[in-house]
């Protein structure tokens, strides 16, 4: 049997990152939605979401995908949106010397040619640790870890952002700033 919390977390990711229209709601331009509105819409679509469960998912998610507003009235996804026009109000940050990206071998030829592209998302997601990048890459198969020369990119004028859950975000990573982890 599937864990109901995992199922609800995936449902929230769908609604808050990609398809709010599946339950007839819209997000504001910063990705927020009133918690009461979300709960009512989820309930109307057969989902048993309560205020307590939502807060538990926000607080206990190992990936910290979601955030509650300071006033406790709204919720949003921290990053990963494919919805156009969402502005997470991120400010540029100075990245560490290196960051990491987990992927699979099948896409390496394209990455070597084009670099890392954001595809349908707003940003390319990078990790501060190899372990996190391995977990991300392993979702699609045997992971290949790419090392990103983040500080060199920053010094070349490329802006980096850091989401509320510590994921580093950038518009793209040109191939000259990438190398494969040989370990």
Feature names for model-found ranges:
Residues 1-183:
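Eukaryotic, polar/proline-rich low-complexity intrinsically disordered regions
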């Amino acid at each position: 049997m599937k864990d109901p919390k995992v199922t609800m977390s995936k449902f929230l990711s769908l609604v808050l990152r990609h398809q709010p229209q599946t339950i007839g709601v819209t997000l504001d331009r910063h990705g927020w939605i009133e918690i009461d509105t979300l709960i009512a819409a989820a309930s109307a679509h057969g989902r048993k979401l309560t205020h307590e469960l939502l807060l538990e998912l926000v607080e206990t998610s190992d990936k910290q995908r979601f955030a509650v507003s300071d006033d406790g009235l709204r919720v949003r996804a921290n990053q990963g949106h494919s919805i156009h026009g969402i502005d997470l109000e991120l400010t540029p940050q100075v990245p560490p010397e290196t960051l990491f990206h987990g992927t699979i071998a099948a896409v390496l030829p394209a990455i070597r040619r084009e670099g890392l592209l954001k595809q349908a998302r707003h940003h390319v997601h990078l990790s501060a640790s190899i372990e996190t990048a391995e977990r991300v890459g392993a979702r699609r198969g045997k992971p290949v870890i790419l090392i990103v020369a983040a500080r060199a990119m920053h010094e070349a004028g490329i802006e980096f952002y850091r989401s509320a859950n510590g994921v580093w975000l950038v518009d793209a990573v040109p191939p000259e700033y990438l190398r494969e982890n040989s370990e």
